A protein has these predicted regions:
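C-terminal motif of bacterial Sec signal peptides marking the signal peptidase cleavage site
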Residues: 13-16
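Amphipathic, heptad-repeat alpha-helical segments
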Residues: 19-53
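Inward-facing hydrophobic residues that define packing positions of alpha-helical scaffold repeats
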Residues: 59, 66, 71, 78-79, ...
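Positively charged n-region of N-terminal signal peptides that target proteins for export
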Residues: 1-4
């Protein structure tokens, strides 16, 4: 009797975990692109700017959110980081 109750409950829980796919691809794509752009900015000598530091902290937060499957927040943070990377490369 317990098996008839536990099995559907377990299936429901596993389905809920697998359903967190919204923003997953954009999070991964934006995060990879932003890290690459950050490396380029560092190579060009912009690592000391305030915008570079803001971008680095945003990317660290985005990576943490990706690990905890908070993909929407990850995507937003990585987009903001890319903005600050562009600002850094512009010297602002």
């Amino acid at each position: 009797m317990k098996a008839w109750i536990c099995l559907p409950l377990l299936a429901l829980v596993l389905t809920g975990c697998a359903g967190k796919t919204a923003y997953r691809d954009s999070c991964a794509t934006n995060l990879d692109t932003a890290w690459h752009e950050l490396d380029l900015a560092k190579a060009e000598g912009f690592a000391g700017t305030v915008s570079y530091s803001k971008a680095l902290s945003l990317l660290t937060g985005a990576k943490t959110q990706q690990q905890f499957e908070a993909f929407e927040g990850c995507s937003e943070k990585s987009e903001k980081a890319r903005f600050y990377i562009r600002e850094s490369r512009a010297g602002r």
